[in-house]
């Protein structure tokens, strides 16, 4: 299914974000997310040998700080023309927990961008029963 204009805009914004910073091992992925009220939030990962947040998690924090509410779609773009990157397992779990209705833009089997529900990417996510 073709991307909507809003979804295509997310790819453009994340690409512009990662291309706006110098090539670096410390900041190699940008993410953009769309809120239900139409705002777009961007961010980049912060690599450090002790660990660090992925770009998607940085965007979640930025959106939360702006009282964005529900996020409806998210994408990650790698530097050096790597294009769309699928969320890692940790990000999939966090997205499922915090925004269970969110879609992530990933590449389909033909390498084309497509937006899929987070539950499709993580059908058997961890459920804490505390």
Swiss-Prot record:
CDD domains in the record: cytidine_deaminase
Any one of the GO CC terms: cytosol
Protein name: Blasticidin-S deaminase
Active site: 56
Effect of residue 56 to Q: Loss of activity
GO term, biological process aspect, one: cytidine deamination
Residues involved in substrate binding: 28, 82, 126, 128
Record text on subunit structure and interactions: Homotetramer.
Catalyzed reaction equations: blasticidin S + H2O + H(+) = deaminohydroxyblasticidin S + NH4(+)
Residues the record lists as binding Zn(2+): 54, 88, 91
Effect of residue 91 to S: Loss of activity
Function comment: Catalyzes the deamination of the cytosine moiety of the antibiotics blasticidin S, cytomycin and acetylblasticidin S.
């Amino acid at each position: 299914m073709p991307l909507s204009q809003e979804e295509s805009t997310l790819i453009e914004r994340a690409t512009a974000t990662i291309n706006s910073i110098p090539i670096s091992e410390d900041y190699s992925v940008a993410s953009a997310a769309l809120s239900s009220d139409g705002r777009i939030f961007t961010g980049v990962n912060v690599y450090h040998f002790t660990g660090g947040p992925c770009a998607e998690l940085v965007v979640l924090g930025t959106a939360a700080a702006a009282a964005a509410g529900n996020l409806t779609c998210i994408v990650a773009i790698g530097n050096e023309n790597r294009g769309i990157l699928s969320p890692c397992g940790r990000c999939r779990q966090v997205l499922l927990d915090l925004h269970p209705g969110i879609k992530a833009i990933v590449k389909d089997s033909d390498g084309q961008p497509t937006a899929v529900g987070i539950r499709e990417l993580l059908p058997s996510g961890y459920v804490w029963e505390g």
